[in-house]
């Protein structure tokens, strides 16, 4: 019995880069696609939002002097590159998918239509959301929160390379304190870097829980959905 039926997974673009630091690492892509295939086979309805940092990092120096709005549009396009790569990886594993973008790209993706996205999920397709919210000044964390609320997801899973939320960066501080559970309010008060404040506020106002967990540990995603206490739960 699944604890969560419909979830949205948020991955950073950097997660796809792996140790390379930029671009798309084929092994990381395959690993994440396999994790999603496993939870899909359990009967979960899965939506996905991916950042674009792995693609955008290569042009970030040039973008530093650009108009913010133009730079943000470049970032949105970077998320679509990752989304197409992920769609291909999933479909090679026999997982049916649909790609929806917040900016019209009719030759390669559907426009985001809420009711259609929900129908795809009900039919067992993994829905990948690209191009963020379609608006500048909003991060892909905020896009993930917004889409999760719109599709009536029961949970956002933020996949990272650490085991959850700590009081400081565990990769820099070996004495960092791990939080198995923490409230939205404490995340905001302690300025913990779970998601950006707009995303956290959206989740808090709509009582949407977040789990932050290590996506690089095989099987974590499936165990979480089956009821194990994995990572950090951010709750009301």
From Swiss-Prot:
Entry binding sites for UMP: 52, 72, 133-140
GO CC field: cytoplasm
Keyword Zinc carried by entry: no
One GO molecular-function entry: ATP binding
Source species, domain of life: Bacteria
Record text on activity regulation: Allosterically activated by GTP. Inhibited by UTP.
Pathway: Pyrimidine metabolism; CTP biosynthesis via de novo pathway; UDP from UMP (UMPK route): step 1/1
EC number in record: 2.7.4.22
Gene Ontology biological process: 'de novo' CTP biosynthetic process; UDP biosynthetic process
Reaction(s) catalysed (UniProt annotation): UMP + ATP = UDP + ADP
Organism: Chlorobium phaeobacteroides (strain DSM 266 / SMG 266 / 2430)
Cellular localisation: Cytoplasm
Protein name listed in UniProt: Uridylate kinase
Entry similarity comment: Belongs to the UMP kinase family.
Gene name per UniProt: pyrH
UniProt region (Involved in allosteric activation by GTP), positions on chain: 18-23
Subunit organization: Homohexamer.
Sorted UniProt keywords: Allosteric enzyme, ATP-binding, Cytoplasm, Kinase, Nucleotide-binding, Pyrimidine biosynthesis, Transferase
Purpose of the protein: Catalyzes the reversible phosphorylation of UMP to UDP.
HAMAP family attached to this UniProt entry: PyrH_B
PANTHER family given in the database record: URIDYLATE KINASE (PTHR42833), URIDYLATE KINASE PUMPKIN, CHLOROPLASTIC (PTHR42833:SF4)
Pfam assignment, any one: AA_kinase
Major site of localization recorded for this protein: cytoplasm
């Amino acid at each position: 019995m699944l604890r969560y039926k419909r979830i949205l997974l948020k991955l950073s673009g950097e997660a796809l880069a792996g140790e390379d630091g930029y671009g798309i690492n084929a092994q990381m892509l395959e690993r994440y696609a396999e994790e999603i295939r496993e939870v899909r086979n359990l009967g979960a309805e899965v939506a996905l939002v991916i950042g674009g940092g792995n693609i955008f990092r290569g042009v970030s120096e040039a973008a530093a002097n650009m108009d913010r709005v133009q730079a943000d549009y470049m970032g949105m396009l970077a998320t679509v590159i990752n989304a197409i790569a992920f769609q291909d990886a999933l479909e090679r594993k026999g997982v049916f998918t649909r790609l929806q973008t917040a900016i019209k790209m009719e030759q390669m993706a559907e426009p985001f239509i809420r009711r259609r996205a929900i129908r795809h999920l009900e039919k067992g397709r993994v829905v990948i959301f690209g191009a963020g919210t379609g608006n500048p000044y909003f991060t892909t964390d905020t896009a993930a929160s917004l889409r999760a609320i719109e599709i009536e997801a029961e949970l956002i899973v933020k996949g990272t390379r650490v085991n959850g939320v700590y009081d400081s960066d565990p990769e820099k501080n070996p004495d960092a304190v791990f939080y198995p559970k923490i409230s939205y309010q404490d995340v905001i008060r302690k300025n913990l870097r779970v998601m950006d404040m707009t995303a956290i506020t959206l989740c808090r106002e709509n009582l949407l829980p977040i789990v932050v967990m290590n996506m690089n540990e095989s099987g974590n995603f499936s165990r979480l959905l089956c009821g194990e206490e994995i990572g950090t739960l951010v709750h009301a």
